[in-house]
């Protein structure tokens, strides 16, 4: 009897974390591509964001860059919840209570300057030891996203233009 109980405890301890992960990534299956840039949110699960508004609408994006675009475009809506992919676990966490890292040597998603969220401050500090950057809160990360918006948008346009030109060259 003791062995059955121990086996049951072991099975549950292995199954429960796995079940939690599939539930926290359900947002990806509901909205696979970013509303603004079309990028695959599953590929960018470590930076993806979800914004739930008080009117019952929600938006799924690939990054804080695209979240900033949505928040600016929906100035008359009030966000009820803003979630972001934890850089370490890829699970959605509350963006406003997360510890953020701005900058460092790892380029951002849709941005030259990275902006990464962590549920645990010590994981953010470990990231900084390996990659550089500075600790920040959500407000500072969002401010950085808006500050970077012009140069990032210009960079994205230039990259897409170069891609289109390469595609045209290959057609001829």
What is the meaning of each model-derived region?
Residues 1-4:
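Positively charged n-region of N-terminal signal peptides that target proteins for export
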Residues 7-15:
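Bacterial N-terminal signal peptides
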Residues 17-172:
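Intrinsically disordered, low-complexity terminal tails/loops enriched in metal-binding residues
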């Amino acid at each position: 009897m003791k062995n059955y109980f121990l086996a049951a405890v072991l099975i549950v301890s292995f199954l429960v974390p796995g079940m939690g992960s599939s539930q926290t990534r359900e947002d990806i299956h509901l909205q696979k591509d970013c509303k603004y840039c079309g990028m695959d949110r599953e590929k960018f699960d470590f930076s993806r964001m979800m914004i739930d508004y008080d009117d019952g609408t929600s938006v799924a994006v690939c990054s804080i860059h695209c979240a900033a675009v949505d928040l600016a475009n929906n100035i008359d809506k009030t966000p009820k919840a803003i979630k972001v992919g934890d850089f370490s676990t890829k699970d959605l966490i509350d963006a406003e209570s997360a510890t953020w890292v701005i900058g460092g040597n790892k380029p951002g998603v849709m941005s030259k300057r990275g902006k990464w969220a962590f549920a645990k401050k010590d994981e953010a500090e470990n990231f900084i030891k390996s990659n550089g950057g500075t600790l920040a809160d959500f407000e500072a990360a969002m401010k950085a996203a808006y500050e970077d918006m012009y140069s990032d948008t210009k960079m994205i346009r230039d990259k897409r233009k170069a891609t289109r030109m390469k595609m045209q060259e290959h057609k001829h």
